[in-house]
Curated annotation (Swiss-Prot):
Pathway: Phospholipid metabolism; phosphatidylethanolamine biosynthesis; phosphatidylethanolamine from CDP-diacylglycerol: step 2/2. It is an enzyme of class 4 (lyase). One of its GO terms (cellular component) is plasma membrane. This is Phosphatidylserine decarboxylase proenzyme. It comes from Burkholderia ambifaria (strain MC40-6). Is synthesized initially as an inactive proenzyme. Formation of the active enzyme involves a self-maturation process in which the active site pyruvoyl group is generated from an internal serine residue via an autocatalytic post-translational modification. Two non-identical subunits are generated from the proenzyme in this reaction, and the pyruvate is formed at the N-terminus of the alpha chain, which is derived from the carboxyl end of the proenzyme. Its EC number is 4.1.1.65.
Length: 214
């Protein structure tokens, strides 16, 4: 199933409008010779805020990737948001990736918690615990707990989350956005089988991160 939304993320509309107005004004005054860098900037802003539809795998026990990017961690560690030991899989997004976040599983949101913090390079490990972040804890119908954490980065300094505790989420459903480079950590129950490896390029909703133990 696909979840309809604008192909250009609504979070980017103000930025696109500002870039377009500036480019048009400079073009009107000085011509294309002066305006071309601003048209180029407009193209960059539009591509940054693109938010394409993605196919969603049908496997019921699959954990879907919540964001586009590259895998930077697959490890067993402590999940501080659900107070348990867990399998953590981390996705780093650079400024050229799509920056919307989508639910990795079907379930109910049991907790949403925001933490202020630093703005370190999101590709490094300590960004998980020291950077500004927003944690979403989801419980599936089978009782499994999946935690998805939006983490701000060196450039990204605005985390947006559109769900609250008690609300349902469907796999692949868009729930948040981080502007200009960031990271998402996913914590899974021990026994889950990772289906990705470090360095692998992944895509929101269409890449299977892991399989939950049945």
């Amino acid at each position: 199933m696909n979840y309809p939304h604008p192909i250009i993320a609504r979070e980017g509309w103000p930025f696109i409008a500002i870039a377009a107005v500036i480019a048009l004004l400079i073009h009107a005054v000085g011509g294309f010779g002066f305006a071309w860098p601003f048209w180029l900037l407009l193209v960059f802003v539009v591509q940054f805020f693109r938010d394409p539809q993605r196919p969603i795998p049908a496997q019921p026990n699959a954990v879907l990737c919540p964001a586009d990017g590259r895998i930077v961690a697959v490890e067993t560690t402590q999940d501080p948001y659900a107070n348990r030991e867990a399998l953590k899989i981390s996705v780093f997004m650079n400024v050229f990736n799509v920056h919307s976040q989508r639910s990795p599983v079907d379930g109910a949101v049991t907790k949403v918690e925001y933490f202020p913090g630093a703005f370190l390079n999101a590709a490094i490990d300590k960004a998980s615990t020291e950077n500004e972040r927003n944690a979403l804890v989801i419980q599936t119908a089978s009782g499994k707990t999946v935690t998805a954490v939006q983490i701000a980065g060196l450039v990204a300094r605005r985390i947006l989350c559109y769900v609250r505790a008690g609300e349902p989420l469907s796999r692949g459903q868009r729930y948040g956005f981080i502007r200009f480079g960031s990271r998402v950590d996913v914590y899974l129950p021990l026994g889950s089988r990772a289906k990705v490896s470090i360095g692998e390029k992944v895509y929101a909703s269409s890449t299977i991160l892991a399989e939950l133990e049945q």
